[in-house]
């Protein structure tokens, strides 16, 4: 209790919490007790509520939070709290100049979950009175600022209203002009679009506020000042929370008017519905519809961002089509289908949705994804179902138009004949060609045998003849076949002293398969043992009928050594060419056949080609097999550079990207892109074939290991490098024939060109031997091979190469085990001797018995033991052998189960080395 009525100092006798009594209109900053002697400053605010109707307007005292608590000095004992007494609330001056005295807040019982209210004393201290005075002064200052702000807002709204009316008039004039221009569409649009009617009367809520001056519904003003919006939306720093926390009534009315609906708190009668033509918003309206921080606080959820003009037009067009049941016309397209295509790409080519294609496949019972690959048949079925036509193409179509171009008969002129010289090895083919060319090619060939296809051109009586020399060795079968395919006439060379041989018969078959006429040249008639008539008789057995025997095949007896009758042979060739009437068109793109190909270290890839049609010139782009290139140079058989190569001329072509296969066709194309496309297609085919071949041979690892263990096949890996493609092909074919059921040659890599470091690395990884045929390893490769311990073998003759590989493969064969029967002995008695064990007393009944030989113990015709003899004695002496009819004693190594009546068979084992 207090000491006097004038003294405001509080004093208590016991421990009691000191608080201030909350007032209905207290505003300002007070101190609130936080417990344990802590306090904090709290701003006390007052909120206003809008009355439902003017007649129900009553002053309502908002529930104010508990007043801040001042903690008193702790007393020894707590004191009983006094009953709460109300104090008169301070007067707050409103902007209108009238004081509004709010009634005191009635006491409400505390709820169960509320904290107990602190006890408020009857008197305030001077500090608390000063705080209340300051809060009252600040409230009055904020009220004055609010009054000034509301006056400015009224002026702003008046200016906006004027601008809005001007924009409305301008918009009405513009709509009238647009309506006149769209009279044809206005009727359909007015009938299709739903009429926009006025909203129903809105119920008056407690938030609604009477408006004495309602405004007519109108669109939003065309322009609004951003500074005015910000001033209206942002409260002043000292403004009361009641002003900051609620929207301005004038803004609510403006927003209601801008949306075309009734203002808040007004009851509007429904107007009759009338059609309204949807117009696109102006740029200013569209800009005003954007979401900003200012409009988000003022407009809230009422301000939605507008759509673009194009989206609105599409929406109207879609709605109009749906109203008049307009359907789009189906566009049928020609779909180009390759051999395989993905569903996504197919849908794009049909201009259909991939989802529709997937749905169709699901109806057909196939679950697929857009990225799945389908074949051309299924793609054609899908395209037909969707109403499109199909044009099927193949990857091989890239080769169309480069070969077999039809020529006009008037453009064809006579060309030289292409003659292939064929026959058995060492029958004098190359020597005959040397005699015709007046050159010595045989001296340049290793071993005196031809191992390449040589192409030359000679002239006889002003007419040119192209000769192709083929090897006669059995390994070069493919070369002879290629020579027969690229030729017009075949000269079959048969030695008069050696008659018809296997390769002679093979050459006859190649010529007949190619459909070319044969001229028989019986060579070596200068020898004493020559018998030309014997050769003619043997040729009859192979259906080669010469003229002297009543047939149509020309035959000439020649001698390559003396040059006898060579002119008659050339005349026979020209006569046969005249009968064939060989012609070609030189004024077209060139095409022909690759005779041979090699990788030259100085010149790169070099291909010997035979031009069969057209004229080949430097600078042209050619495709040969799976390689292509631009012709850098043309070199003839004499080493001269040519400006062009007419039909039937053999030339060397420089400039290819790689070495083509011998026998590949070549053709000139118009561009590098076309050449690259054809080359990539052929390379892809080659890879697919190789992969299919390897997968068919290899199988799974488990199957391969099982096969290797069951069959015992051993492999001899090889890396083969040769000078030309044809020689490599011949070597591979010869080595493949060496294989048996137990051992075979596995060619890890083969190619044309010198031996490089990469070949050494490959041989090291695969544990293979390296074979070089007419090539050598460079210095780096030799050093690398020496460091890695890789053996490189060089060969110039295919005979030696095949023989060495055959011998090496024979070493992989397991030796043959051969048993030789020596004799039999019958056990008569079994003795048990100390320190020796059981000894069988036997009689040799057949052959003889040798010490150290293998023995078998046979009981009832069943072998029960196989081993070696430990001792062989006759009487007490060790003997090396016992002949038939004599008795002896025998003991086995590590075996003593011998019985009377058993038979001992003695044999000798020999291991014999096998060869292929």
Swiss-Prot record:
Pfam families, per database record: EF-G_D2, GTP_EFTU, GTP_EFTU_D2, IF-2, IF2_assoc, IF2_N
Q: According to the UniProt record, where is the region G5? A: 559-561
Q: What is its main location?
A: cytoplasm
Please indicate which superkingdom the organism of origin belongs to.
Bacteria
- Which PROSITE patterns does the protein's record reference? G_TR_2, IF2
Stretches of Basic and acidic residues bias are at: 125-182
The positions making up the signal sequence are: none
Q: Which residues bind GTP?
A: 423-430, 469-473, 523-526
Asked if the Swiss-Prot or TrEMBL record annotates the protein with the keyword Protein biosynthesis, the reply is yes
What GO CC terms are in its UniProt record?
A: cytosol
Q: Where is the composition biased (Polar residues)?
A: 97-108
Function comment:
One of the essential components for the initiation of protein synthesis. Protects formylmethionyl-tRNA from spontaneous hydrolysis and promotes its binding to the 30S ribosomal subunits. Also involved in the hydrolysis of GTP during the formation of the 70S ribosomal complex.
Which protein is depicted? Translation initiation factor IF-2
Protein's organism: Rhizobium etli (strain ATCC 51251 / DSM 11541 / JCM 21823 / NBRC 15573 / CFN 42)
């Amino acid at each position: 209790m207090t000491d006097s009525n004038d003294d405001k100092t509080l004093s208590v006798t016991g421990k009691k919490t000191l608080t201030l009594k909350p007032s209905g209109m207290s505003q300002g900053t007070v101190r609130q007790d936080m417990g344990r002697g802590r306090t904090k400053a709290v701003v006390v605010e007052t909120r206003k509520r809008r009355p439902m109707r003017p007649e129900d307007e009553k002053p309502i005292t908002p529930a104010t939070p508990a007043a801040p608590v001042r903690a008193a000095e702790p007393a020894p004992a707590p004191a009983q709290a006094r009953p709460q007494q109300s104090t008169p609330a301070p007067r707050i001056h409103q902007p209108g100049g009238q004081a509004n005295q709010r009634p005191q807040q009635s006491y409400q019982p505390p709820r169960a979950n509320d904290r107990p209210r602190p006890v408020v004393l009857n008197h305030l201290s001077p500090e608390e009175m000063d705080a209340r005075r300051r809060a009252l002064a600040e409230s009055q200052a904020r009220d004055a600022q609010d009054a000034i702000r509301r006056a400015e807002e009224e002026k702003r709204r008046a200016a906006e209203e004027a601008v809005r009316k001007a924009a409305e008039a301008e918009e009405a004039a513009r709509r009238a002009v647009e309506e006149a221009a769209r009279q044809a569409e206005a009727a359909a649009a007015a009938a299709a679009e739903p009429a926009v009617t006025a909203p129903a009367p809105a119920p008056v809520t407690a938030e609604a506020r009477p408006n004495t001056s309602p405004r007519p519904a109108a669109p939003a003003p065309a322009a609004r000042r951003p500074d005015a919006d910000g001033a209206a939306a942002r409260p002043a720093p000292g403004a009361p929370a009641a002003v900051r926390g609620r929207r301005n009534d004038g803004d609510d009315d403006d927003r209601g008017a801008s949306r075309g609906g009734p203002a808040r708190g007004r009851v509007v009668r429904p107007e009759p519905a009338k059609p309204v033509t949807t117009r696109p918003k102006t740029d200013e309206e569209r800009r005003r519809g954007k979401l900003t921080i200012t409009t988000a606080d003022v407009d809230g959820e009422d301000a939605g961002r507008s759509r673009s003009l194009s989206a609105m037009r599409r929406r109207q067009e879609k709605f109009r089509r749906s109203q008049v049941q307009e359907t789009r016309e189906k566009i049928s397209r020609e779909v180009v289908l390759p051999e395989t295509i993905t569903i996504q790409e197919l849908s794009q080519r049909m201009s259909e949705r991939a989802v529709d294609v997937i749905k169709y496949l699901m109806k057909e019972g196939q679950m697929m994804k857009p990225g799945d690959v389908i074949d051309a048949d299924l793609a054609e079925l899908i395209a037909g179902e969707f109403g499109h036509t199909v044009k099927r193409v193949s990857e091989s179509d890239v080769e169309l138009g480069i070969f077999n171009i039809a020529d006009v008969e008037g453009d064809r002129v006579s060309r030289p004949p292409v003659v292939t010289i064929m026959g058995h090895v060492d029958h004098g083919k190359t020597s005959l060609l040397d005699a015709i060319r007046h050159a010595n090619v045989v001296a340049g060939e290793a071993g005196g045998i031809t191992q390449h296809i040589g192409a030359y051109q000679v002239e006889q009586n002003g007419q040119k003849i192209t000769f192709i020399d083929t090897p006669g060795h059995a390994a070069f079968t493919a070369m002879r076949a290629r020579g027969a395919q690229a030729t017009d006439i075949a000269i079959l060379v048969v030695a008069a002293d050696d008659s018809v041989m296997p390769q002679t018969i093979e050459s006859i078959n190649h010529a007949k398969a190619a459909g070319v006429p044969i001229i028989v040249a019986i060579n070596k008639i200068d020898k004493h043992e020559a018998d030309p008539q014997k050769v003619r008789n043997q040729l009859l057995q192979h259906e080669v009928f010469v003229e002297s025997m009543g047939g149509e095949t020309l035959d000439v007896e020649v001698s390559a050594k003396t040059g006898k009758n060579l002119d008659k042979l050339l005349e026979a060739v020209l006569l046969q060419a005249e009968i064939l009437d060989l012609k070609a068109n030189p004024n077209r793109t060139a095409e022909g056949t690759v005779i041979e190909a090699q990788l030259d270290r100085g010149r790169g890839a070099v291909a010997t080609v035979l031009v069969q049609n057209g004229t080949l010139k430097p600078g042209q782009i050619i495709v040969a097999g799976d390689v292509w290139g631009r012709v850098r140079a043309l070199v003839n058989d004499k080493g001269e550079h040519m400006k062009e190569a007419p039909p039937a001329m053999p030339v060397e072509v420089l400039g290819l990207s790689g070495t083509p296969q011998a026998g590949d066709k070549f053709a000139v194309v118009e561009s590098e892109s076309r050449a690259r496309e054809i080359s990539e297609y052929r390379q892809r085919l080659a890879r697919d074939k190789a992969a299919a071949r390897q997968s068919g041979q290899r199988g799974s690892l488990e199957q391969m290991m099982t096969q290797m263990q069951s069959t015992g096949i051993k492999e001899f890996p090889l890396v083969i490098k040769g000078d030309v493609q044809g020689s490599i092909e011949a070597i591979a074919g010869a080595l493949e024939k060496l294989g048996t059921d137990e051992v075979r040659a596995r060619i890890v890599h083969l190619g044309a060109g010198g031996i490089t470091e990469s070949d050494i690395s490959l041989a090291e990884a695969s544990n293979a031997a390296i074979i070089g045929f007419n090539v050598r390893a460079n210095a780096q490769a030799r050093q690398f091979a020496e460091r890695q311990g890789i053996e490189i073998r060089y060969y110039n003759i295919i005979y030696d190469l095949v023989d060495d590989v055959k011998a090496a493969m024979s070493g992989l064969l397991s030796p043959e085990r051969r048993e030789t029967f020596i004799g039999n002995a019958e056990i008569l008695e079994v003795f048990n001797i100390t320190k020796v064990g059981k000894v069988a007393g036997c009689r040799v009944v057949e052959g003889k018995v040798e010490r150290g030989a293998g023995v078998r113990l046979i009981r009832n015709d069943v072998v029960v033991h196989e081993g070696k003899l430990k001792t062989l004695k006759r009487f007490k002496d060790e003997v090396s052998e016992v002949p038939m009819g004599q008795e002896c004693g025998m003991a086995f190594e590590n075996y003593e189960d011998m019985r009377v009546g058993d038979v001992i068979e003695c044999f000798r084992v020999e291991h014999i080395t096998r060869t292929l």
